């Protein structure tokens, strides 16, 4: 628990980029973890628990993809209104490494190297596992994070985090060498 002002961290990045590994290091230091995968529901459903924990003086770490400004905004706004600094820890693991990590996770848990959406749906355990997803999900998330420009116009706005959103700092985690 914090002495004085609580501290908040948002860990973001593509699926299978290592967010939960970084989040665990905060949990080990006493931060309360909020994660949509564990809580179920939608990202916006975490806003009220986030506020309550900060109001109680607790340090909080948010663990989710947060690849769009729209998903981050309710949390940056809540932290700003409560006067709590919110750091963004951005996992910049490459798309290729995230793909390898996701396939490795599928194999480790279910002995499948690659699962399609229908394979996952039909598998009794994988269908209930929020950390198992078709690779198409990675493509969609990458598109949201990087944005898509056609003829100089953003067709899909860039979702990369900026200091203008209200973060106290942005820490970029490069992929391992």
Task: Place the predicted regions along the sequence by residue.
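Conserved GTP-binding G-domain of TRAFAC-class P-loop NTPases and closely related GTPase folds
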Residues: 2-12, 17, 25, 29, ...
